[in-house]
Curated annotation (Swiss-Prot):
It comes from the Eukaryota. Keywords: Disulfide bond, Lectin, Plant defense, Secreted. Homodimer. One of its GO terms (biological process) is defense response. This is Lectin. Disulfide bonds join 37-54. It comes from Coccinia grandis. Binds with high affinity specifically to chito-oligosaccharides. May play a role in plant defense against pathogens by directly binding with the chitin cell wall. Forms filamentous structures at higher concentrations and may promote wound healing by forming filaments with phloem proteins like PP1. InterPro entries: PP2-like, PP2-like/Lectin. One of its GO terms (cellular component) is extracellular region. Detected in fruits (at protein level).
Length: 157
């Protein structure tokens, strides 16, 4: 179970549904089991990387039309988190190629507390917005980043 449609207005993509660069190498990422509504799922815990790149894709046919969705990622910065003083790029790309992009610095976020990282908002309204919805979170600067845990990416009305 890597994604879960909780209702027609709430959709979750768990970390295993994402493409996380270096996630198959235990020197950089580890997978922590968590219970979610009786399902055994995993959070992705970053040990350290310099090339931080996380990508998710969902088909908009899984979403309800003419409903505004708020897209966010659950993140926790551990007590030893560091290297987050350069901006992360957040992108939400619609099937028609239109993009929402922003940047965020995580260095000053509270430690050991889950928070929502806002990715954007969207509405699936017609054939131009039907297809693959792509969400990205990345920073390719060479400084080492460590100590973040990724939870689910949520699309909720």
């Amino acid at each position: 179970l890597n994604q879960e449609k909780l209702s027609s207005t709430h959709f979750l993509l768990f970390p295993r549904a994402a493409t996380l660069t270096w996630s198959d190498d235990t020197r950089y990422w580890s997978w922590n089991p968590v219970d979610f509504c009786g399902y055994q799922l995993e959070e992705a815990q970053l040990s350290r990387v310099s090339w931080f790149d996380c990508r998710w894709t969902v088909n908009t046919t899984d979403l309800k039309t003419n409903v505004w969705y708020n897209v966010f990622l659950k993140v926790q910065m551990g007590s030893g988190a560091s290297g987050w003083n350069t901006p992360l790029n957040l992108e939400l790309e619609m099937p028609n190629g239109s993009k929402q992009a922003s940047q965020v610095v995580l260095n000053d976020r509270p430690r050991d507390v889950w928070f929502k990282l806002q990715m954007g908002n969207l509405m699936v309204s017609d054939s131009e917005t039907c297809g693959a919805l792509r969400m990205s979170l990345y920073n390719h600067q060479t400084n080492w980043k460590m100590g973040a845990t990724l939870g689910p990416l949520a699309l909720e009305a």
